[in-house]
From Swiss-Prot:
Pro-sequence residue ranges: 22-74
Notes concerning its domains: The presence of a 'disulfide through disulfide knot' structurally defines this protein as a knottin.
InterPro entries: Toxin_22
Membrane spanning stretches: none
Keyword Nucleus attached: no
Keyword Signal: yes
GO molecular function: sodium channel inhibitor activity; toxin activity
Protein name as annotated: U11-theraphotoxin-Hhn1i
Predominant cellular place of this UniProt entry's protein: secreted
Length: 113
């Protein structure tokens, strides 16, 4: 039993004495690792920024493009919103304010003459 204790004590002392390094070495190693991590984070941040700028440019380009659906639509039937100042919108119909009040009370709609 004593040999086991002595062996354990010897292994413990060796592990503690050999395992402890210089504080300066540990500090330098930690600084190197953090600097590498910072450079990696800077690289990742720049890459993400480039991708976001490309995406933003693409979205702005899509918004500014004219499509055939972006032009003003004409009234094609009764009950469709219209502009009171543009009589062409309601061809064959009259652009009037609704008689019933509701959430649409400020807008005009096409009605039959």
């Amino acid at each position: 039993m004593n040999t086991v204790r002595v062996t354990f004590l010897l292994v413990f002392v060796l592990a503690v004495s050999l395992g402890q390094g210089d504080k300066d070495e540990n500090r330098m190693e930690m600084q190197e690792k953090t600097e590498q991590g910072k450079s990696y984070l800077d690289f990742a941040e720049n890459l993400l920024l480039q991708k976001l700028e490309e995406l933003e440019a693409k979205l702005l380009e899509e918004d500014s493009e004219e499509s055939r659906n972006s032009r003003q639509k004409r009234c094609i039937g009764e009950g469709v919103p219209c502009d009171e100042n543009d009589p062409r919108r309601c061809s064959g119909l009259v652009c009037l304010k609704p008689t019933l009040h509701g959430i649409w009370y400020k807008s005009y709609y096409c009605y039959k003459k």
